[in-house]
Amino acid sequence: MVHFTAEEKAVITSLWGKVNVEEAGGEALGRLLVVYPWTQRFFDNFGNLSSASAIMGNPKVKAHGKKVLTSLGDAIKNMDDLKGTFAHLSELHCDRLHVDPENFKLLGNELVIVLAKYFGKEFTPQVQAAWQKMVAGVAIALAHKYH
């Protein structure tokens, strides 16, 4: 599993305290659905996903994005046990939803882009490296139940 230094934990936690979960979550998930349109098949009950503007304005996309980032917030509180934190979600996404685990990496990368957009100069190379490590660790934890 991923090991975070005290400095990485501090950097991640500090920035996380400033994140608007609803806004950033909706934008990250929306970007995933726009940039990687094949991921839309997992969200067929979300209604209109016919264009970038429809996706980015879709209330179900925003709500699910918020839900995703709320789970990420739980992970940030438990950085030393990402696998345990995401055990249930890993099982759900593997056994019931059959989500390609590669999509977790893609969403993590979109989140890093969104954070960089929102935090600008505050999103230094050090901050980016810590967040890349965080989203990679989450992707590994979510993929854990896959065979």
Swiss-Prot record:
The keyword Metal-binding applies. Gene3D superfamilies: Globins. It holds the Pfam family Globin. It comes from Eulemur fulvus fulvus. Belongs to the globin family. Gamma chains make up the fetal hemoglobin F, in combination with alpha chains. GO terms for molecular function: haptoglobin binding; heme binding; hemoglobin alpha binding; metal ion binding; organic acid binding; oxygen binding; oxygen carrier activity; peroxidase activity. Residues 3-147 form the Globin domain. One of its GO terms (cellular component) is hemoglobin complex. Keywords: Heme, Iron, Metal-binding, Oxygen transport, Transport. This is Hemoglobin subunit gamma. GO terms for biological process: hydrogen peroxide catabolic process.
